[in-house]
């Protein structure tokens, strides 16, 4: 399945379908609709598609040189305490800067949670100076001797095809993108964070559709009432998240340079809660059959809980509450 996902991603890129509108440019909803569509088909594919399109948006926002035609990108920003990548300028190693004027560097260290690293042609990742300052962003071509993609450690069942493995860099050539802190401080950071909620919503919609189909086929009967109750709960949950995403997209397009952190936290937490409702209600209403006899349903039901763990759960609720306490509850009014 991992090879199939990589092939499908490349097909989307080659067909121009990964050239999504930039977030905050007036078509944010269209961007998120594309993410949701891919998510509804395959969440491992959505994970890689979202990373590729996020990397392109980041490099465009930070004024990076054009990407090679047909290239596929991973966006890797996880910073666990036991995995860090540091850089030194190439001219410190006796080499000149790149001809395109970018700051050429050498990367050393290990990067964790690199989704799609086995198939990506390039990576965009957070890196640090040897003195601990940063983070910076660096873009790196994967096909070079100084890049080693791990084949171990990824034991996931859900999201297995996203293959979020470790990558080890040993004097790998790369170029810095933007100044220190640019990745976290740019307005697009939270635009991208909100977009992940669209992927989750797409996956949840596919599971919900199975419940809808089963309920609609059975018609109105007392025996079907439990499915109808479940479908009502699922309908409310999905509509809640979809409405929040539409509202957030309009706001971001109207305020592209403003802080969208609270909006992003709301849509992510809403999408997570809605997906939890869908997972619970579809299982209770449909029983074991689709989990055991419908390969697409079974994979989606296995993938979605794993992808949702990209949420920070209660920590995000705390951040949202802190923000509301500081700015006020104006958005509660109609």
State what each model feature region is.
Residues 202, 232-239, 265, 269-276, ...:
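Generic structural signal for well-ordered, non-transmembrane alpha-helical segments
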Residues 110-144:
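DPxDG-like acidic metal-binding loop motif
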């Amino acid at each position: 399945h991992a090879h199939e996902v990589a092939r499908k991603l490349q097909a989307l890129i080659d067909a121009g379908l990964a050239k999504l509108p930039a977030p905050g440019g007036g078509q944010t909803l269209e961007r998120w609709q594309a993410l949701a569509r891919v998510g509804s088909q395959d969440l491992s594919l959505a994970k890689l598609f979202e990373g590729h399109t996020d990397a392109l948006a980041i490099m465009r926002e930070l004024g990076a040189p054009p990407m090679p035609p047909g290239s596929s990108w991973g966006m890797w920003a996880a910073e666990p305490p036991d995995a860090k990548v540091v850089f030194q300028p190439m001219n410190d190693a006796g080499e000149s800067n790149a001809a395109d004027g970018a700051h050429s560097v050498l990367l050393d260290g290990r990067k964790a949670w690199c989704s799609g690293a086995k198939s990506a042609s390039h990576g965009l990742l957070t890196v640090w100076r040897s003195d601990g300052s940063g983070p910076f962003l660096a873009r790196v071509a994967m096909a070079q001797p100084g890049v080693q993609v791990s084949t171990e450690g990824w034991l996931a069942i859900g999201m297995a095809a996203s293959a979020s493995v470790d990558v080890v860099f040993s004097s790998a050539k790369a170029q810095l993108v933007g100044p220190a802190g640019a990745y976290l401080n740019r307005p697009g950071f939270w635009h991208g964070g909100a977009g992940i909620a669209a992927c989750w919503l797409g996956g949840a919609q596919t599971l919900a559709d199975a419940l809808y189909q089963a309920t609609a086929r059975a018609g109105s009967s007392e025996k079907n009432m439990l499915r109808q109750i479940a479908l009502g709960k699922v309908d409310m949950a999905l509509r809640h998240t979809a409405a929040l995403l539409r509202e957030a997209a309009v706001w971001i397009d109207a305020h592209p340079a403003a802080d969208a952190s609270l909006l992003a936290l709301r849509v992510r937490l809403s999408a997570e809660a809605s997906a939890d409702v869908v997972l619970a209600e579809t299982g209770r209403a449909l029983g074991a059959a689709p989990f055991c006899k419908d390969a697409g349903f079974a994979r989606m039901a296995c993938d979605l809980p794993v992808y949702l763990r990209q949420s920070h759960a209660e920590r995000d609720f705390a951040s949202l509450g802190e923000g509301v306490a500081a700015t006020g509850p104006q958005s509660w009014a109609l």
